[in-house]
Amino acid sequence: MKGVQCAIFGDGDDTIIMLPDERMLQWYLMGVDAWFLEMGFVMKVEAFGSDFSQLEFCQTRPIEVRPGEWLMVRNPKSAFAKDHHSQTFWTSELDMRAWLKAVSEGGEAIAGDVPVFGALYQAYGRLAGNARPRADHYDLPYVMLQMRMGAGRRYFARPSDSARVSFYEAYGITPGEQQLIEDEFSDLEVGWPPERVDAANVDGSYLVGCRTWIGL
């Protein structure tokens, strides 16, 4: 591993190592286990690849949101499953709409101009009406950390052509399919009180006994 030119990106859990030349791959594979072991880590090495659009880091892949501007975007399948689920207890319709507003604002900040994602978070904002997020909807220490790091902020905007093509290359959803999904989100409605759903009606046994709202 020593002497091999590379770029390393890590978050304490996942790590990506990028090499400038595929010919260096064999040298890297020969030394990576020992190199990490010297620092006290037993490292699991996954498959390598040369397709930049399939580079995966913390369940995100690179999307060219504007020509020359890249953004790591969450996997839509896992992201939407999580973004539809609330761990905040709702006692009223206002609680529900306040939660929708919080998710909308957070989603806009990280993916407002990303295909499919932007449309979902815009729909949440529309459904929230005039509700305002509650303090317990925010992870304040994380927000402060992001501010100190100077993390960028995105805004709702129509996805660019490059974003649609890049999103397709990363996740296999064609530009036409993206627009159809966005149309579905634009028609999304909610109701109160929530209805109980069982695992037989949704994808995921962990949802047994969870509650959802009409129309989602």
Regions found by a protein language model. Give the residues of each.
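Secondary-structure transition/capping motifs at alpha-helix termini
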Residues: 1-2, 39
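Catalytic palm active-site di-aspartate
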Residues: 2-20, 59
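Short, glycine/acidic-rich beta->alpha junctions
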Residues: 7, 27, 101
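Polymerase palm active-site segment centered on the conserved acidic dipeptide of motif C
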Residues: 21-81, 106, 116, 123
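Conserved NTP-donor binding/palm subdomain of two-metal-ion nucleotidyltransferases/polymerases, i.e.
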Residues: 69-109
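C-terminal, non-catalytic extensions of nucleic-acid polymerases
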Residues: 95-216
